[in-house]
Swiss-Prot record:
Subunit organization: Interacts with Orco. Complexes exist early in the endomembrane system in olfactory sensory neurons (OSNs), coupling these complexes to the conserved ciliary trafficking pathway.
Cytoplasmic side: 1-33, 88-130, 221-259, 312-359
Membrane topology: Multi-pass membrane protein
Stretches of the chain forming a coiled coil according to its record: none
Pfam families the record matches: 7tm_6
Glycosylation sites: 178
Protein role: Odorant receptor which mediates acceptance or avoidance behavior, depending on its substrates. The odorant receptor repertoire encodes a large collection of odor stimuli that vary widely in identity, intensity, and duration. May form a complex with Orco to form odorant-sensing units, providing sensitive and prolonged odorant signaling and calcium permeability.
InterPro entries associated with the record: 7tm6_olfct_rcpt (IPR004117)
Note: The atypical heteromeric and topological design of the odorant receptors appears to be an insect-specific solution for odor recognition, making the OR/Orco complex an attractive target for the development of highly selective insect repellents to disrupt olfactory-mediated host-seeking behaviors of insect disease vectors. Odor-evoked OR currents are independent of known G-protein-coupled second messenger pathways.
Family of this protein: Belongs to the insect chemoreceptor superfamily. Heteromeric odorant receptor channel (TC 1.A.69) family. Or49a subfamily.
Name assigned to this protein: Odorant receptor 85c
Gene name of the encoded protein: Or85c
Subcellular location: Cell membrane
Length: 389
């Protein structure tokens, strides 16, 4: 499916087959399993080392280092949770994709009726931009220590950088000036790629599915509004029955979508609240300009991720509620009285807005981002107060 290609690319890079592909060979599946568990084990070891470092930094009174490593841990938690929930919900996701393929427009005529090209261009543009942003973020972090070494020590010769690693971790041995440095550098870069790809792939998958849901809602709204009604109750009732059935299929898609993504989205919002707070705090404690650029990129990427999810949540809410307005715009005045009475019930259902949900606790719209930023700022103010004291 064209909408899914970018998400599948990033899932493949971490060894995940997000939904069943009948044509996939057993050899490819075996390689995917090996790659997946290599990613998981490596990432788990790295985050365990970061957690140990957090304890050491806190006990030694290194407040800034503790906050820094907390932002790294939060980033990993979001990436791992998204990967594991997609891996766990593979059967449900496969059924969802099959249903999307079943109602996908076939042929040039249907594609034009659905305005497929418009939605596909929008999804592709957002997917590419978002994937590039996160890729630049993670590789800026991964290669930052190497670039510092090459620029400051080798090129400009203004200070000695030495061997440094991208992320703060606890090590029970001295890795400086020996071969283990290169192993650790590779493992940390590998872990950074895994965590970023886990987030990119799941966010792009959500983007692809949400775009198709909006496309079907919009198509149904146009069909309902443009339907020419007359006094033929038999024909009008058949049209209304088909409309209700189509609407129910879209609502079932949303139920499955919320079931698959609900918990990962809730974790995403909870952790992102603290990550935004931690990164913002680091930017206010007098870091060098090069570190400031890195932190700004981290903050901007985290905000972009939250906005992307909230944006698609808003699109789904708007598209679902607009169906009742389209039904009211019909020329129902010309229809049989029985159709008018039935139409009242149809109009009532879309007035109960369909939301993208982070479980039962949160309906996601653009207002959700405002709420998240308010909470994040409160924690930021608390953190600043603790640091000053």
């Amino acid at each position: 499916m064209k909408f899914m290609k970018y998400a599948v690319f990033f899932y493949t890079s971490v060894g995940i087959e997000p939904y069943t592909i009948d044509s996939r060979s057993k050899k490819a599946s075996l390689w995917s399993h090996l790659l997946f568990w290599a990613n998981v084990i490596n990432l788990s070891v790295i985050v365990f080392g970061e957690i140990l470092y957090l304890g050491v930094a806190y006990s030694d009174g290194k407040f800034i280092d503790a906050v820094t490593v907390l932002s790294y841990i939060g980033f990993v938690i979001v990436g791992m949770s998204k990967m594991f929930f997609i891996w766990w919900k593979k059967t449900d996701l496969s059924d969802l994709v099959k249903e999307l393929e079943h109602i996908y427009p076939n042929g040039k005529a249907e594609e034009e009726m659905y305005r497929l090209d418009r939605y596909l261009r929008s999804c592709s543009r957002i997917s590419i931009t978002y994937a590039l942003l996160y890729s630049v973020l993670i590789w800026t972090f991964n290669l930052f220590s190497i670039m510092q070494f090459l620029v400051y020590e080798k090129l400009l010769k203004i200070r000695v950088v030495g061997q440094t690693l991208p992320y703060l971790m606890y090590f029970p041995w001295n890795w400086h000036e020996n071969w283990t440095y290169y192993v650790l550098l590779f493992c940390q870069n590998f872990a950074g790629h895994t965590s970023a790809s886990g987030q990119i792939s799941t966010d792009l998958l959500l983007c692809a599915v949400a775009t198709q849901v909006v496309m079907h809602f919009d198509y149904l709204a146009r069909v309902v509004e443009k339907q020419v009604l007359d006094r033929d109750w038999s024909e009008n009732s058949r049209f209304l029955a088909k409309t209700v059935q189509y609407h129910q299929r879209i609502l079932r898609l949303m139920d499955v979508l919320n079931d698959i993504f609900g918990i990962p989205l809730l974790l995403n919002f909870m952790v992102s609240t603290f990550v935004i707070c931690f990164v913002g705090f680091q930017m206010t404690v007098g870091v060098p300009p090069d570190i400031m650029i890195k932190l700004f990129l981290f903050l901007f990427s985290s905000l972009s991720q939250v906005y992307l999810i909230c944006h698609y949540g808003q699109l789904i809410a708007d598209a679902s509620s607009s169906l009742s307005i389209s039904a009211y715009k019909q020329n129902w005045q010309n229809a049989d009285i029985r159709y008018r009475r039935a139409l009242v019930f149809f109009i009532a259902r879309p007035q109960r807005t369909t939301y993208l949900k982070a479980t039962i606790f949160m309906n996601i719209t653009r207002a959700t981002m405002t709420d998240l930023l308010q909470v994040s700022y409160k924690f930021f103010a608390l953190l600043r107060t603790m640091y000053i004291k």
